[in-house]
Amino acid sequence: MFWSILAVLFVVPLVALYFVVIRSVDRYMPEPWWLLFLCLVWGAVGAVVPSVVGGLLGQEALASALNPQHTEQGVKLVENTAATFLAPLIEEPAKALGLLAIYFFSRRRVHETHGPLSGMVYGGIIGLGFTFTEDILYIVGAAEQVGAAGFFGVYFLRTILLGLGHATFTAFTGLGFGLFVTSQSGWRWAMPLFGLLLAMMAHGGRNLFSSFLALEGAGILFALMIHGLVVVLFFSLLVWLGFRDRS
């Protein structure tokens, strides 16, 4: 209980900061607070539940398929495979369901124009909700294993250095939904799927370098580089779309 409370106290301020930064980009036609709150709740609860269940079932299936030896290397093989290939395939669609619900709901009830910028903001907030719950689970797990060193090590890596990861991934899916709403192209139906594919690729690529390719820390460095590039792209798109909507 102590580690859980401490994790919440440490994670909440950063998630709140990320929330304010993402929302502040869309000042011209800001999304309603209640809808952003629902996005946060979906990411923190709605998307986490199927992700955890699917992840556990998937790891069991991988363990049966790979049939690793009951050694540290065998366990690591299953964990790395799940992180690189399984997690993106489960977590990104789970988060995308929130965006799908927003689209169908807002068609009838919300009158704001949900274009690419709004889609990225909604996706980013859903991702932050997911980060909130996932980071607490990982931080508490590390603390229970190795104490304070595990707590602060995982907190620094996941919440500070990689804290915007899920927000950027799901924002790509949101961009696809936003383009679907505003585009007149015959390919508009494929745009949410393309955004989801980008989200899964970015997610899997980052996890690849932090798992299979984590060679004496080099993989972590590359993971941080990929994360940094994705975050720069994320905010560049947000700013550009924000200026475009004002003009």
Residue ranges and their predicted role:
Residues 1-247:
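Hydrophobic alpha-helical segments at protein termini of multi-pass membrane proteins
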